[in-house]
Amino acid sequence: MLLWTIQPLEVVDILETKGIFTCDTNLSENFEDFHDAYLWLVDEMDKRNIPHPTNLSLPLWAWHTRNYKHKKPDFRTIGLGCPGEKCACIEFEIPDELVLLSDYNSWHYVLNKMWFDDSKNEEEWEKNQDWYETLEPSIRNKMMVDSWQKIFDVTPIKGEWVSNGAYVQAVFWELKKDMVKSIKYFTAR
């Protein structure tokens, strides 16, 4: 599988010297804010038998699809790093069985601890939300966590109310030097 990961320039140095790069939990941005979501995703990787090195707590992230296209990110877009930061876009090839794909937009249901319902329009969504709020907290929580499985459906859908697969992210445990196909440098906007 061909993927692209956006990393600080130091990661290129780590790959050159150590031959492998992994996530350092202490340096992971947003870990404290999204601890539960990240650990849920790690658990999902484990449930899918993605080989998990025992010394690693968090995976690395990469892009698979942007704007419904499987191609490297457009460096002119915002959100690929802190504005003004010099970054490296590392293109690499990794075996499919070492990767878990998910819909980037849907991932926000997990990050924000929200129920991911099946509404097809706003009226239906309001009705579903009203019903959901009447449930016991333990039932709501189970429904919410169960609903998150939908983030792993990356089938492209372009709808007025429902869209899916426009932005697909990938998580994996290790980036090895021999996986790297190319590195492009850019300044984040």
Predicted feature locations:
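Membrane-interacting alpha-helical segments
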Residues: 20-50
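Short, well-structured hydrophobic secondary-structure segments
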Residues: 39-70
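Short hydrophobic-aromatic micro-motifs
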Residues: 3-5, 62-63
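Conserved NAD+-utilizing ADP-ribose enzyme module
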Residues: 1-2, 9-13, 17-30, 56-58, ...
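Short, functional N-terminal and low-complexity linear motifs
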Residues: 5-10, 36-39
